Amino acid sequence: AGSNDTDHGCALAAKSAACGADALLLVTPYYNKTSQSGLVAHFTAMAEAGGIPVILYNVPSRTGLNIAPETARELSRHPLINGIKEASGNIGQVAKIAALCGDELNIYSGNDDQVVPLLSLGGKGVISVVSNVKPELVHNCCKAWFDGDTAKARELQLEMLPLCDALFCEVNPIPVKYLSLIHISEPTRLR
């Protein structure tokens, strides 16, 4: 659920929960740039409206608004906010979030080209675009890391890079959908 209107976002969160969603992925409000305290109020209201676990989605390149590490720390104290899809592309920021939040906030990579660097900072996985085309590659990369085979994880991360470039030559999800149309990947569908 995502909205730049908190009331509308709360309605979407509640409806998602009522329809059986297990969790909410909540993107930062786009277009209307709020303050960091405004982000706390926005995400808190949406989490409470949904009443189910929340993963924050930080993608400032798309929304124009970044969740600061200190804001992530404050939000991690909410009992329903237990994760962040970190797609800022700033590994230093990810390190600071990890240092501030510890085990209170599960960090997931939102950038397929930074899976292993993020895992090395204590990340729990990736919410991936590449996995729509090569799910086994992304799975095996994460599995290798968690199995302690960092050399294999690094090798698979590097193998992903050309695919990352191809999948982001246009705005997502255009390349993924195109690949499904020409039968290079499984057809995309709602999950």
Residue ranges of predicted features:
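Active-site beta->alpha loop and helix N-cap motifs at the rims of alpha/beta catalytic domains
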Residues: A1-G64
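Alpha-helical scaffolding segments of alpha/beta enzyme cores, especially the outer helices
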Residues: H8-C19, G38-A49, E70-E74, G92, ...
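Conserved functional loop/turn residues at catalytic and ligand-binding sites
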Residues: G20, G50-P53, P79-L80, G122, ...
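Generic leucine side-chain signal with a strong bias for well-ordered alpha-helical environments
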Residues: L25-L26, L56, L75, L119, ...
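Catalytic alpha/beta core domains of metabolic enzymes, predominantly
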Residues: R62-F168
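C-terminal substrate-binding/catalytic lobe of Rossmann-fold NAD(P)-dependent oxidoreductases
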Residues: C169-I174, S180
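Residue-level detector of conserved catalytic or cofactor/ligand-binding positions
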Residues: S180-L190
